[in-house]
């Protein structure tokens, strides 16, 4: 939008630009940045303030307007960008989402209904997480909101923050394995790559391997084929890496997994 207004080419942003350009309060994981040791942390600004949960209906409306603009190959109105995108997010993913804060400053990821949805994706993801917990899986803490829309909004509590708000280093399996978007069963990558990382780099190896096995079996049982490397993560503890709570589990009713389940098959 800025490039169009200033009549200049779009500037290409590097991975580091995305990492440092995010609001400091909501940046995923434990990284914070300064220009020099004696300066303040960068991107601590009121203009980048994370919206409160009470504004959820306005955020859903902004998300829908941005999606509508994309469908029509148009630039969205700046007011929607200011409301939803300007605070910054390092969350990624295909669905419309944003960071929000509860009254006690707890951080949540809010996943909004999409204009393309033909079923209640948020409610099904909530149901999947409840099933996962019943199956003994360490799953992210989530809840759903009925906001007057056709479908529910899912709220997933950020697990890279302690109860007191302290930061915990997080990295996706894709990052820790040195892979790229699109690396999956089609490029001969799969769960055994994650197994190798756990054996070589994690603490409490046996427990993490058992946890991963439960997640593989569960994803197959519910038909969650969106199990790519970004949807598996690790937290860094004082003793080493451990699997993060499971997240983004949603039935997609696909016969094949995104990742190889064995050395040769993703079925």
Predicted regions and their residues:
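Phosphate/dinucleotide-binding and metal-coordinating scaffold of catalytic cores
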Residues: 1-267
């Amino acid at each position: 939008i800025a490039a169009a207004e200033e009549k200049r080419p779009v500037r290409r942003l590097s991975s580091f630009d995305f990492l440092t350009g995010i609001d400091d309060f909501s940046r995923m994981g434990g990284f914070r940045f300064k220009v020099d040791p004696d300066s303040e942390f960068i991107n601590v600004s009121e203009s980048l303030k994370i919206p409160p949960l009470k504004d959820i209906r306005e955020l859903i409306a902004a998300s829908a307007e941005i999606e509508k603009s994309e469908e029509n190959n148009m630039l969205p109105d700046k007011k929607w960008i200011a409301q939803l995108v300007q605070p910054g997010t390092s969350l990624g993913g295909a669905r419309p989402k944003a960071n929000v804060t509860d009254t006690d400053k707890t951080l949540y990821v809010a996943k909004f209904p999409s204009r393309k949805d033909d079923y209640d994706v948020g409610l099904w993801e909530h149901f999947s997480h409840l099933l996962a917990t019943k199956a003994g899986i360490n799953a992210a803490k989530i809840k759903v909101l009925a906001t007057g829309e056709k479908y529910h909004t899912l709220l997933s509590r950020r697990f890279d923050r302690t109860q007191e708000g302290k930061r915990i280093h997080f990295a996706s399996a894709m990052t820790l394995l040195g892979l790229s978007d699109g690396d999956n069963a089609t490029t001969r990558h799969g769960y055994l790559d994650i197994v190798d990382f756990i054996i070589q780099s994690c603490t409490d190896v046996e427990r993490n391997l058992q946890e991963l096995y439960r997640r593989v079996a569960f994803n197959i049982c519910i038909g969650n084929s969106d199990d790519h490397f970004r949807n598996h993560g690790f937290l860094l503890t004082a003793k080493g890496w451990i699997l993060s709570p499971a997240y983004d589990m949603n039935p997609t009713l696909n016969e094949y997994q995104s990742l190889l389940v064995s050395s040769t098959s993703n079925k």
